[in-house]
Design a protein with these regions (language model features):
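N-terminal Rossmann-like FAD-binding beta1-loop-alpha1 element of flavoenzymes
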Residues: 15-42
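Glycine-rich FAD pyrophosphate-binding loop
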Residues: 35-55
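Central helical "cap/lid" subdomain
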Residues: 50, 198-250, 277-284, 297-302, ...
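Dinucleotide-binding Rossmann-like beta1-alpha1 core, especially the glycine-rich loop
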Residues: 59-141
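Active-site lid/adjacent beta-loop-alpha segment flanking the redox-cofactor pocket in flavoenzymes
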Residues: 65, 242-355
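C-terminal catalytic lobe of FAD-dependent flavoproteins
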Residues: 301-416
């Protein structure tokens, strides 16, 4: 029992929501709400959707495994299953999505990966989910020479994120408002009003969802969601007859895709310190050098290297996304301050939240895999449909979790 993570039963006057941000997170929650009969106004400051962190030509959808079963592994496994099933359903319904479930090989390129491989091999997991391969089997599956064994995920693959986002929002219930920057939000008379750069109201609704990536803290004066920003750049390589033999995604410290739209996509850099958000030749060289270290024979087949896409991806200190309601910080500070004394949960009141305000973000580089499940859970929360089996995961993703940790340490949050 964790009353600070409990959600109320919502009673909405209208089933209309505003979502800020049309990357994969914003498009996913818009789609999930539309499936529940909501209308959605989706605000995007760029000229088109999926231009920032979701702007790569190709991105990977795959699980993330640990040597021993863990909460993190369970989350990524569940999210992977959800995303691949969602894609199968969308494609069966006629959606135009560039999804290539060609499989992924995570190379045993260092001691840590080798130890993980050995542990996974001993767990005898289902072969349609995971296989442990030696270097010969890896080379056969990849279609190119590999010096390493690998963990093979046959249902993984790569996708064009923009095509995924576009398919999600091609619903009559969703209205895209592009080239409009949401500068501020205000709440009055049970409505959230979103103001643009001129101060005008561009949309309003009882429910507002912040899905604006690195900018979510721009709209939450009373709470700061801890985020770690990382600049990542992907690179492109022109395919040749030799390089086009690659049949599946290769994972090492980065990733490499088979040829797609006359490019191999590989990368990505991981820079915690940066001054500008832009592609650079230096980052291309770093990506290329890393690829040469693990796949030298394949690299010898490639001639021309080009810059791909650079963007800031934000993750959280515990690497789990945020999916849930925005807490009332003053209420938490007043009613949960005694957590530092170790009082039992039964003595605390149910949590209080900012009315109708929700957040979905902090996906890092794995938003294509995890955003669907997180959006589904957030939609369940908004629609009073939380299943008992999902409660523990919702607690893990709760936007107030770092606030609670702060209060347990006896530190009161700054309240504006």
């Amino acid at each position: 029992m964790s009353p600070w993570f409990d959600y109320p039963r919502y009673q909405w006057q209208q089933r209309h929501a505003v979502v800020i941000g049309a990357g994969i997170a914003g498009c996913q929650i818009s789609w999930h709400l539309a499936q529940q009969g909501w209308t959605v106004s989706l605000i995007e400051r760029e000229t088109d959707i999926a231009r920032q962190a979701s702007g790569n030509l190709a991105g990977v959808i795959s699980p993330k495994m640990t040597a021993k079963p863990s909460t993190g592994e369970q989350f990524y496994h569940q999210a992977f299953d959800y995303s691949t099933q969602q894609l199968a359903d969308l494609l069966a319904a006629g959606a135009d999505i560039d999804w290539h479930p060609c499989g992924m090989l995570q190379l045993n390129h260092n001691e840590r990966e080798q130890q993980r491989w050995e542990a996974l091999r001993d767990r005898n997991l289902p072969a349609d989910f995971l296989q442990c391969t030696d270097s010969e089997q890896t080379s056969q599956l990849a279609g190119i020479h590999c010096d390493y064994g690998a963990t093979y995920f046959p249902r993984a693959g790569f996708i064009n994120p923009a095509s995924f986002c576009r398919a999600l929002i091609q619903q009559p219930e969703i209205t895209l408002i592009s080239q409009v920057e949401a500068m501020s939000i205000a709440h009055d008379d049970k409505q959230w009003r979103i103001h643009d750069t001129d101060g005008g109201v561009v949309a309003q609704a009882e429910v507002l969802i912040l899905a604006s990536g690195k900018d979510i803290n721009q709209f939450t004066d009373s709470i700061v969601f801890p985020q770690l920003g990382v600049l990542g750049q992907s690179s492109h390589a022109m395919p040749t007859q030799g390089s086009s033999a690659l049949k599946c995604v290769i994972g090492h410290e980065g990733y490499l895709t088979p040829a797609y739209q006359s490019q191999h996509v590989f990368g990505a850099t991981f820079d915690r310190e940066f001054e500008v958000i832009a592609v650079s030749d230096t980052s291309d060289q770093r990506n290329w050098q890393q690829l040469q270290e693990y796949l030298p024979e394949w690299c010898a087949e490639v001639a021309e290297i080009n810059s791909g896409h650079a963007a800031v991806r934000t993750t959280t200190p515990d690497r789990y996304p945020y999916a849930g309601a925005v807490p009332d910080t003053a209420f938490y500070a007043e009613h949960y301050a005694a957590l530092k004394h170790g009082r039992t949960a039964e003595t605390y009141p149910q949590a209080s939240y900012q009315p109708g305000l929700f957040v979905l973000g902090g996906f890092g580089s794995r938003g294509l895999t995890t955003s669907g499940l997180c959006a589904k859970l957030l939609s369940d929360c908004i629609n009073n449909q939380i299943a008992d089996k999902d409660q523990a995961l919702l607690n893990t993703l709760h936007p107030a979790r770092f606030l609670i940790r702060q209060l347990r340490r006896g530190k009161l949050p700054a309240i504006s």
